[in-house]
Amino acid sequence: MNREPLFITSHESRGTIKGDREYMTRIAVDAMGGDHAPFEIVAGAVWAAAEYGVALELVGKQDRIEQCLEVIQQEGFMSPCGKAGKARRVRVDVKALDIKITHASEIIEMGEAPGQAIRKKKNSSIVLTVNSVATGSSDALVAAGSTGAAMASSLFGLGRIQGIDRPAIAVTLPTMKKPIVVIDGGANSNCTPQMLKQFAAMGRIFSKNVLGVDNPRVGVLNIGEEAGKGNELAQQTYTLLEDEKEKFNFMGNVEGRELFLNVCDVVVCDGFVGNVVLKVTEGTASLLLKMIKSEFKSDILGMIIGTLAKPFMKRIHEKINYEEFGGMLLLGVKGITVISHGRSKAYAIKNAVRVAKEAVETCINKKIAESIA
């Protein structure tokens, strides 16, 4: 399955034209990470390559990746597609795609300590995936395995953007209107006010360039709206952002109950709080959908109403389904890292590759560096 790439691979030639063909963005994918690896990961990656016109570097056990590609070429794969969410068979002509396979002899498991694991397993799939971006072989990476390993590998392998103390995870959450960004989503449990100020700057760039929000509004997640509310971190962060209110389009404190009411576009908090928000949101959304479905099945009237409401339920599911967002960008490192949910299947991986491609094309790291300078 390895073959000569169709497009130029020089890192210095990104965005140039060879002959009459423009360079194709290459995304490195950790094929061995996640609960459904490698088949669902490979399937989502090739699906994205076919739909979004990207080249791929699939990193992992070469024989298993090749087996996946062969099955996909011959049989396709089942996946929910489009707004209806109905599962259908997806067909992809794998042979027509620009795919490079990099063999990785090791895998970092979910329970391993990230820092120790990446030092011990230098030939692991996530380490080699990061190395592909670090050396310029690929433009961005997608990983659905250990979040800690993906973050640690990216931090040590790619390095931090100058002026950024710590990278942060940008989490996209749905609201009644447009999506919002919660940052940090879990990279840093202990933060300083200066770090949260940097998160605000990075979150604004993400919101503007990836989500298309003009002049994103920033808020500090807190237990009350007043300036003196919250712990020392929240109060000092409030002061820093208030001092540069126009630059950050700072709206003040945001309470948890206001999170999904579009009072701001970027919500800053430490990674401990942000990750709890993410997990509670996922759990609540899942619970509500299950409760509604259960009520629809409770009696004949419920079944009738449920049948009539099915199109509306599908649209709601689409808005709150994590698979639609694909993955979370790790902002602040010298490279594009998209971290997907460990439960991700093909559709989520396809969208994660799309997020990676958009981040490359919008030059998000360059804009972060310029904003911090």
Where are these regions (language model features)?
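Glycine-rich phosphate/diphosphate-binding loop of Rossmann-like nucleotide-binding domains
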Residues: 39-40, 55-57, 189-256, 270
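N-terminal phosphate-binding or glycine-rich loops at protein starts, especially the Walker A/P-loop
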Residues: 19-67
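Phosphate/nucleotide-donor binding subsite
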Residues: 75, 90-138
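Short, glycine-rich nucleotide/cofactor-binding loops
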Residues: 27-39, 118, 187-197, 339-346
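Short Gly/Ser/Thr- and charged-rich N-terminal loops/segments
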Residues: 14, 82-90
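Compositionally biased, intrinsically disordered low-complexity segments enriched in Pro/Arg/Gln/His
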Residues: 3-6, 11-14
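Glycine-rich phosphate/nucleotide-binding loop
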Residues: 155-168, 172-182, 263-267, 271-373
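Short glycine/serine/threonine-rich phosphate/pyrophosphate-binding segments
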Residues: 37-41, 122-136, 140-154, 161, ...
